[in-house]
Amino acid sequence: MKTDIHPKYVAAKIKCACGTVIETRSTSGDISVEICSNCHPFFTGKSKLVDTTGRVDKFKKKYKMK
């Protein structure tokens, strides 16, 4: 087998926008993410209200249906 063909597997820190830092190992070094399990709505149980009109509502509004 060939030697030294695999990438270096080094200690890395994953930094979230909320300030959480998770230490792990990676081939790419330090990683920055926007959302993690500490601030994601699925894991926290807090839902975010997204005020968007659905396709059906847009259709009804366009054709003035009730």
Swiss-Prot record:
InterPro entries: Ribosomal_bL28/bL31-like_sf, Ribosomal_bL31, Ribosomal_bL31_A, Ribosomal_bL31_sf. GO terms for cellular component: ribonucleoprotein complex; ribosome. The keyword Lyase does not apply. Pfam families: Ribosomal_L31 (PF01197). Binds 1 zinc ion per subunit. Zn(2+) binds at residues 16, 18, 36, 39. Its cofactor is Zn(2+). GO terms for biological process: translation. Disulfide bonds: none annotated. It comes from the Bacteria. One of its GO terms (molecular function) is structural constituent of ribosome. Keywords: Metal-binding, Ribonucleoprotein, Ribosomal protein, RNA-binding, rRNA-binding, Zinc. SUPFAM superfamilies: L28p-like (SSF143800). Binds the 23S rRNA. Belongs to the bacterial ribosomal protein bL31 family. Type A subfamily. Part of the 50S ribosomal subunit. This is Large ribosomal subunit protein bL31. It comes from Leptospira biflexa serovar Patoc (strain Patoc 1 / ATCC 23582 / Paris). The gene is rpmE.
